[in-house]
UniProtKB/Swiss-Prot annotation:
Ranges in a coiled coil: 12-43
PFTA repeats: 49-82, 93-126, 129-162, 164-197, 206-239
Signal peptide: none
GO biological process: endoplasmic reticulum to Golgi vesicle-mediated transport; protein geranylgeranylation
Organism: Dictyostelium discoideum (Social amoeba)
UniProt keyword annotations, A-Z: Coiled coil, Prenyltransferase, Repeat, Transferase
Single annotated GO MF: Rab geranylgeranyltransferase activity
The keyword Coiled coil belongs to this UniProt entry's keyword annotation: yes
EC number: 2.5.1.60
One Pfam family from the record: PPTA
SUBUNIT field: Heterodimer of an alpha and a beta subunit.
Name of the protein in its database record: Geranylgeranyl transferase type-2 subunit alpha
Cellular compartments per GO CC: cytoplasm; Rab-protein geranylgeranyltransferase complex
Reaction(s) catalysed (UniProt annotation): geranylgeranyl diphosphate + L-cysteinyl-[protein] = S-geranylgeranyl-L-cysteinyl-[protein] + diphosphate
């Protein structure tokens, strides 16, 4: 009928979508073909066109690692033919391009690897900007381990204070106790900040308080329990820490949690580890805990059985 808007059927929509996808695939294949023809023609000699053509492919498919290698070879060749000022411009442009890629593909290993490679070649990488980029991305996805890895890379190669990063991880774990990456980041920087045994011991005791809040809030989440396990191993390694008394106190605290969550495996598992570490408990008592864990978590039966060798 005239004047009546035609509504597409589901079949028509699917067909239109398929045609759109085919056009995109065809366009991508043409880009790849252009790149391969250029690479063959150049025969190991690179220029700005090398970067331009390879860029078009990577914008669509950042997992094409061969092309990232190609770009690095091109840039390495430029270091032999160009002035440093020209190279710095190339590096800056590369960082801008990579940021565009990251906005679309936040978890591509090859993008992050290439970004770090470029950053180390720059005379003055803007590390603060790098950190802000990671912070921005983590606000959208707190579990993006590429961002957390990049933050560690930044801390290693810059003068950014570890204390600031510790504060950041505190904010993140308090926002979400399930943030495994934030807990892991914490474990990697604490020993670097508190280098003296006395200082580290004092901080570790504070950390037991922090993680206690976490396990009481989210007792079934593994993140904070794994961090608790790291705290136990760390305090044990500190000379004159009187760690056995600390572990006994932890054991008492976790008993209280088990009363509230009798069917939660993590506090039960942690009591087993603590009792093995403290020593002096009856073997049958520990075997009973292992049997209880196997009932609660049969998928990890073999692991729990392996703990019998430590009793």
């Amino acid at each position: 009928m005239h004047g009546v808007l035609k509504v597409r059927t589901s079949e028509e929509k699917a067909k239109a979508q398929r045609l759109k996808e085919l056009e995109k695939i065809e366009s991508y294949n043409k880009l790849v073909k252009s790149f391969e023809e250029l690479r063959e023609k150049q025969n190991g000699r690179y220029d700005e066109i090398s970067l331009s053509v390879s860029k078009l492919v990577l914008i669509e498919n950042p997992e094409f690692y061969t092309i990232w290698n190609y770009r690095r070879l091109a840039i390495l060749q430029f270091t032999e033919t160009k002035e440093n000022s020209e190279l710095q411009v190339i590096y800056q442009n590369e960082m801008k391009f990579l940021e565009e890629c990251i906005q679309r593909f936040t978890k591509s290993y090859w993008i992050w690897f290439h970004r770090q490679w470029i950053a180390l070649r720059m005379d003055n990488c803007d590390w603060e900007r790098e950190m802000k980029l990671c912070t921005k991305l983590l606000n959208f996805d707190l579990r993006n381990f590429h961002c957390w890895g990049h933050r560690r890379f930044i801390l290693k190669h810059s003068n950014i204070k570890l204390e600031d990063e510790l504060k950041y991880t505190t904010e993140k774990v308090e926002q979400n106790f399930s943030n495994y990456s934030a807990w892991h980041q914490r474990s990697s920087i604490l020993p670097k900040i508190y280098k003296e045994p006395e200082q580290l011991l004092e901080k570790i005791l504070e950390e037991f308080e922090l993680v206690r809040n976490a396990v009481y809030t989210e007792p079934k989440d593994s993140s904070s329990w794994i961090y608790h396990k790291w705290l136990v191993a760390t305090i044990k390694s500190i000379p004159n820490s009187n760690y056995i008394e600390v572990l006994k106190n932890e054991l008492t605290q976790i008993y209280d949690l088990i009363e509230l969550e009798p069917d939660c495996k993590w506090p039960i598992y942690t009591t087993l580890l603590l009792k093995i570490e403290i020593g002096g408990f009856e073997k049958q008592e520990l075997l009973d805990i292992i049997s209880q864990l196997i009932k609660l978590d049969p998928d990890h039966k073999n692991y729990y059985k392996s703990l019998e060798t430590k009793i």
